[in-house]
Every structure is written in C-alpha cells, then in structure tokens.
Amino acid sequence: MFGFAGTDYEKVRGDFRKVTDPYSGNEIFVVPAIRPDWAVIHAIRADGNGNVVCSALEADRLAVLAARQAIVTVEEVVPAEDLVARPGEIFLSALHIDLVVAAPLGAHPAGCVHSYGIDRAHMEEYLAASKTAEGFSEYLSRFVLGKTEEEYRELACGKAV
C-alpha cells in the first residue's frame, strides 16, 4: 500500500509489514487480506440465480469476492434470459452470490447509478443526526425502527414504491 511511509502505522498496526516491491525495488507496506463473513451490496438488477449487473464499482466486486457469503439487494430482479442476452453487462457471477433481494430504492439516501441520484437533503439530515448518539437514535426512531420499507420510502423519499 502506498502512502504509509513516514506514518505511525508500522508502530500501531502489528499486522502491517514493510517489504521490498519485487517490481520496483521500493519499500512498500502490505496488509493481510480481509475475509468478512458476509458482504452486502446494492445493484441495478440481477437474475434470481445471482448474476448481477451494477455499476463497475471495484470495491463492491472485491467485497463480494473476499467474503465467505454475499447478499445483493437490487432495484429489480429480472428473468435470467434478460442477462444471458447481454453477458457483457454481468458484473458478478451467480457463483459468488448467496441471496438476491428485490429492494427498489435500496441504496437510498445514496444513489444507484442509472436509477436515481443521491438524495442530498436526506443525506445531510442523516449526517447531521449521526453526529451524536441522541441524534442518531432519533433518526432511527423516525425513519427505521418499527417501519416497513414502504413507510421508510414514504417518510424519507415522499413516495411509496
């Protein structure tokens, strides 16, 4: 990893190692791979088998590939034939996905490429609320706890889907 030279990471993180890059000869830091139990990502669409079409966010792909199991929430579950007809759009193979869940507006208040943008007003409300434990608790009570997906969408987005 670049950018750690001259920092205290080497002292405070015993699992960071400085090694010689075999390609450049420069000293670099390496870190152990993360192996989470689960990865959960949101995508544009997938078929029921788990073949996923989403924006080319490499972080999403890496999270799924690193995890022992993966869930993908999607704007739309489509028939497998729709994806087979356009194999170049498949970003993640069903081999890596354990569960597909239809969740329209599931990325809200963040955006979902080709579907909807960031809800800046709601994101600002969330960020302001999350600055304190009390504010975050109030946010959860208002928008999340005890709410159905439809109730959340109505409260947060002003529409039901």
Residue spans for each PLM region:
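Conserved alpha/beta enzyme-core scaffold
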Residues: M1-V161
